[in-house]
């Protein structure tokens, strides 16, 4: 079973990394989502979010960095949620 969990984490991490890269390829797709957290200079934040998601995704994909990546992902989600609440 742990091997299956590792495979799921690897695939999920790679999927997150691909989504992060998509922020650079088609940033307009993410502007609507990002605008609620960052209403000013939204495009810049789309790129920053893409970089963070790519890094966290790659971290999740590698077993050696998975624990750190989970902590980073939790911090990132709290940061985003805080910005959404603050900019309501």
Question: What label would you give each PLM region?
Answer:
Residues 1-88:
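Short amphipathic, positively biased membrane-proximal segments
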